[in-house]
Amino acid sequence: DYSSMVNFARCKCLGANVLRGPDQLPWDGKLEYDWQLWIDSDIVFDTNKFYQLILNSVPAEAVTKQQVLEPMKNEKGEVIKNKDGSDATKLAGYNIVVDPEKERPIVSGWYCTEDGRTTSVAHWLDEEDFAANGGVMNHETLDTIQKRKKPFTVDYAGFGWLLIKKGVFEDFDENGKKKMPYPWFAPKMQVFESGTVQDMCGEDVSFCLDAKEAGYEIWCDPRIRVGHEKTRII
């Protein structure tokens, strides 16, 4: 199945059907999943980059370690007792427990764009700064992103290497309204403060804008760089 409209093609990747309405679920709720990994066909990566992306979704504050104790035994295999009669124990290891409420819902790595200078992640600018920047958003550059040492939030991340947690497309707000209704990738008009500067944005930008408006943070890990195959791999 094929569509030349990128925004519609992305919806089709999630099994969408226009007849199911705005509250529909990816794959009609029939496919169990934990995360969606979006990969463009021109991205160059290995399994290490994939596992790094998974780790980026689980920040340190989401993880707790629970001690696992086991009885201490003597040479005869008998359980050693404490003075109070309880079993003596020793540390056998840890159980790692992840709080799903603290996982990052949308995470990405990054890649270089065809100009060889800018990257696939960007920050929003107000109208004055947008004009001063030549009518483009404040993209991280190769220089700026390489100075970053830990994950940071962005307003936009390209879909070439992006991980989305289950719930982003499924959740409802406190009023029972779908946070991210279908069509999930519909292009939108970006209108700045004066109303005189406006333009259509791409389907990935509009998804990110809608996700942020719905309360989801978008995290980029500067340590996860993947290749981008253009006239050369960058």
For each predicted feature, which ranges?
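A short beta-strand-loop structural module common to alpha/beta enzyme folds
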Residues: 1-4
